[in-house]
Amino acid sequence: MSQPTTIPGIIRNTVANIHPENHTFLLHKVKDSWVEISYGQALEKIDAISAWFLNMGIKKGDRLSLIIENGPNYVYYDQALQQIGAVNTSIYPTLTESEIEYILNDSGAKAIIAGNPFLFRKVLKVANNCPSLIRIIPAFDDFEKHSDKLKLNAGVINFEQLIQEGLGLVEQYRHQINAAREAILPSDISCLIYTSGTTGIPKGVVLTHHNLFQNVVNSLIQIPFVEKTDRFLSFLPLSHVFERTIYHISIYTGAQIAFAQSLELLAKNMEETKPTILCCVPRLLERIHDKAIKNGTSAGGIKTKIFLWALETGKKYRLVNEAGKKPGILLSNQQKIADKLVFSKIKAKTGGRLKFMVSGGGALPKNIGEFFGDLGITILEGFGLTETSPVMAVTERHRVIYGTVGRIIPGIEVAIQNVDTRHIYTIQTHDNFKEDLQTEEGEIIVRGHCVMKGYWNKPEETATVIDADGWFHTGDIGRFYRGNLQITDRLKNMLVNAYGKNIYPTPVENTYLKSPKIEQVFLVGDKREYITAIIVPGRETMQETFGLNNEFFEKTDVFIEDKEIVDWIGHDLRKLSNELAKFERIKAFKVKRNPFSMDDGEITPTMKAKRKVIEKKYATDIDQMYLQETEAD
């Protein structure tokens, strides 16, 4: 069998050349037990679904939508539609009904699978406003009570029933399925991924099989240690391209995929499944860091002393290794003791087999990466956007430089361009890598196999981000540091104060997030005389410190006025302000009772703040901070 060049070719290649059909492919929890699904079992369902869709009249290029949690059903549906040349159009489960309606109509989706009753009801409410939608597929039992009384233009069929009907059609359509799979070209569209964005209407990013496949093979050149014996624990939404890339990499290498039940059960699922690979966002790593520090320092007495000694030992050991030197006998022995007494207990919470974690979807604060490095847990940072398929750069395991996102992957060019003059400071590739390269800061632009085909139905918007020379303008500000790409912030996030000083919120916010008291920081200050912020304290820490019950967080007042709590936060803000330039320091702040959330439309699914939404929503409260300062500096 020739090497694959498209997404549906990957799983067939794995079965032909890496694992037999009876080898475990997927794992998911059913009631109290983890159930293994072999490649053969998965392919049987995948072919059945393909046959059913062909019988329905689905053809190459048709869009088929998903609004479903991670799990085997996502894989079956995705692989089935991909191999007949249809286009995966995933929808974030957290999106509103109006956003779902917009995506279904903009994409012209002909079918949608809904993962649970809540998501099914969302789809039902907008279905009759979507003329192209002809099938709604609930992936759960007892769906009739939600849909029977409704007059729907689209037909409704349970996913399990669809599969059973498809099994009876497979032989009839076997040749057509195989022919459809072979007819897919690398230039054909594989998926539409609608970026929620921090502003405006969602845009459908058009990614081809070439985009996604090349991202897989070239990322693996950078991280060649993903193997067929690995196990990936999936919990970030597969509707996001970052998680989907690791899903593709797992299939390509023959690694198993286990599906976490939920974010709340992630810690338990890690201990149960013992993964070797995990993808996460920086906020999760920050929470693990905060909890570990809190547990280690609150024990008191000799336990706290041992914990702090172990961290210091881990840091010394890491720094020696990073300098390319060999640790001495004394330090090596101390490291073994630190690992036995402290680090091994933290690692055990991950299942004890973790080779590395990949952090993406935002910049990882330098101190968080260093903390995990001190424990002996490798964090590889990746960088990219939905529009870049997504990976542009990823850390090499032998060359971790905290605060950077690694080396450019093969096959693409990345340049740093002056925002005002458009002068290009440097163009870098994987092959011209220089360890000592340091450049000016500017907008990161990229061209090559990773760049999207464009925005669906939006040629003008496509032309604003992909220039005549093929450069995609990411909107991210960064530079090269010690050969690696380093991200500062989003260009559109930049604040320019009343005195003309440029302030990038993300690095400033990350400085204040070093406080274990603080969960979220939202900086304000564009065209203002000084910086202010909305601060969200960590709920658990605040409850323990002030003896608060759950009713406190259910109060209708958005902001906490209690002077004791405000001063408690202010103490850490003043201390951390010393790490910043004076014009970057928070001068006034408000303490928000509950976190910014996706449900309230304040953050994206990748936990990025929707700055314009938040500024508009809390405009009156923000204005008050410029009338009367709550001193933090």
Segments the model singles out, each with a brief description of its role:
Residues 25-79, 96-101, 158-161:
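Conserved AMP-binding/adenylate-forming core of the ANL superfamily
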Residues 95, 112-114, 448, 453-454, ...:
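AMP-binding/adenylate-forming catalytic core of the ANL superfamily
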Residues 423, 432-497:
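Conserved ATP-binding/catalytic segment of the ANL
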Residues 520-523, 529, 548, 570-633:
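Conserved C-terminal "lid"/linker of ANL adenylate-forming enzymes
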Residues 36-40, 160, 181, 190-216:
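Conserved AMP-binding A3 loop
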Residues 22-24, 137-138, 156-194, 201, ...:
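Conserved pre-ATP/AMP-binding loop-to-beta segment of ANL
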Residues 213-233, 238-343, 353:
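Conserved AMP-binding/adenylation subdomain of ANL enzymes
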Residues 55-56, 79, 83-165, 568, ...:
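Structural core segment of the AMP-binding/adenylate-forming
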